[in-house]
Amino acid sequence: MSMQDPIADMLTRIRNGQAANKVSVSMPSAKLKVAIAQTLKEEGYITDYTVAGEAKPVLEITLKYFQGQPVVETIQRVSRPGLRIYKGKNDLPKVMGGLGVAIVSTSKGLMTDRAARQQGMGGEVICYVA
């Protein structure tokens, strides 16, 4: 059976891995998943990520903790296959009053809500991270 929402699966693996205090989590790789992992790394929510394998690449994300507590408090899928959520540049949400980030898919690639606002772009809101 094929996976209906691989992004939700990725976010759930990160959430469950941190709840179980795992060092890292691995999952099947895809370009969009790697772009999300890159954004999470740039924002400081994960330590690192690697892609290994040729035929079936595997994305391994090294989770980040601060004083034994997970850095990611909440990670929530917004736009999903059954209900896509698009926001214009003026309607992009501020997660936790600006403390968290919304990951947005724009015509110039994946970026945070802050970067999209600076570039004057809207797009599909993939997830919230705080």
Swiss-Prot record:
It holds the Pfam family Ribosomal_S8. It comes from the Bacteria. Keywords: Ribonucleoprotein, Ribosomal protein, RNA-binding, rRNA-binding. GO terms for biological process: translation. InterPro entries: Ribosomal_uS8, Ribosomal_uS8_CS, Ribosomal_uS8_sf. Part of the 30S ribosomal subunit. Contacts proteins S5 and S12. This is Small ribosomal subunit protein uS8. The gene is rpsH.
